């Protein structure tokens, strides 16, 4: 009786709106704000000029002249999300303006205090995260037009030109491609609760197609992002101050803490999409990978993290399929796992091109003094990137079910 009550509670709670998940845009923030109230004009003036201010080595001087602004005029959730993006972007530019050789160790109080305040209100860390760079950082050129790269632009940018735009906007398209898959998870949980194999089969087929669409969307990265520009110019502005050899003690947030604080940089692992797919499919990763992936959930909007936790608590898809015996659902499940493994293989190849190969080319061209070489074998989130991704792919493929298992 208790199990039935719990299942019913979980099924009813997996309505996307409860978790700030859009039926149309998934984890993307629908139609993000592009401007803050006039009170925050000093922030916006700097944020809109970030590429120029960083490249001309003027950003730090402008930050030191910023007034300390009160956050109480940020009255809506969407305003807070834009404020977090703006302050995070200014922070990354401030810390890394002079490259990895001269990172700033202290964030001035006029930036640190409001950034930490907004972060606490949102339940996010005071550093640039995936929900800033991607989920909140897109707008349509033509509001009535399609969500495709030719009709998209970023709200806040960094040095890197078209490659930086491409990196962010292709990732927006990846998040959009995941929307049918996210809906399939909710449908699948309900199907298990209702013991409806036909509905579950439909959900699994929808999930597989979505995963394949994600892989196709990710492939556009090669069309829009130059590996050398990503490695030499863009990557440093996604790097954090945890598990980073060039900032071993972290960053002091002046007016907030006298001790340095450590936060990981941006990482694909901060996207909720593959976490959600793993939870639904019952993929079991090794402890080291799990520790990192779960730490990355603290870099997600709390409502998205709650969705993942509720998926974890939902009835087990693998157990249901094994109990049901060989059939269409088992085959469809395995096809989902295979598609997820193929996506992860594609991601590995992309990381090899954009980080490993780009680092090697930089060394061969005697450009290493310009490149973030201390980070060259690590993701911006602080992981040893290839070994982590290969482990995650291996554990994904181990989830394949054998008939009669």
Curated annotation (Swiss-Prot):
Pathway assignment: Amino-acid degradation; L-tryptophan degradation via kynurenine pathway; L-kynurenine from L-tryptophan: step 1/2
Q: Which residues form a coiled coil?
A: none
Task: Give the UniProt keywords, A-Z.
Answer: Dioxygenase, Heme, Immunity, Iron, Metal-binding, Oxidoreductase, Tryptophan catabolism
Q: What's one GO BP annotation on this UniProt entry? A: L-tryptophan catabolic process to kynurenine
**Activity: how regulated:** Activity is inhibited by D-1MT (1-methyl-D-tryptophan) and MTH-trp (methylthiohydantoin-DL-tryptophan) but not L-1MT (1-methyl-L-tryptophan).
* Keyword hit for Cell division: no
The UniProt GO MF terms for this protein read:
heme binding; indoleamine 2,3-dioxygenase activity; metal ion binding; tryptophan 2,3-dioxygenase activity
Instruction: Output the Gene Ontology cellular-component terms.
Output: cytoplasm
Return any one Pfam family short name.
IDO
* Keyword Metal-binding (UniProt): yes
Catalytic activities: L-tryptophan + O2 = N-formyl-L-kynurenine
Listed EC numbers: 1.13.11.-
Extract the Gene3D superfamilies matched here: 1.20.58.480
In terms of domain of life, where is this protein from?
Eukaryota
Residues bound to heme are: 347
Q: Which InterPro entries match?
A: Indolamine_dOase, Trp/Indoleamine_2_3_dOase-like
The broad enzyme category this protein falls into is oxidoreductase
The entry sums up its family as follows: Belongs to the indoleamine 2,3-dioxygenase family.
Q: What else is known?
A: Ido1 and Ido2 are 2 distinct enzymes which catalyze the same reaction. Ido2 affinity for tryptophan is much lower than that of Ido1. Ido2 may play a role as a negative regulator of Ido1 by competing for heme-binding with Ido1. Low efficiency Ido2 enzymes have been conserved throughout vertebrate evolution, whereas higher efficiency Ido1 enzymes are dispensable in many lower vertebrate lineages. Ido1 may have arisen by gene duplication of a more ancient proto-IDO gene before the divergence of marsupial and eutherian (placental) mammals.
Q: What does this protein's UniProt record list under function?
A: Catalyzes the first and rate-limiting step in the kynurenine pathway of tryptophan catabolism. Involved in immune regulation.
The name of this protein is Indoleamine 2,3-dioxygenase 2
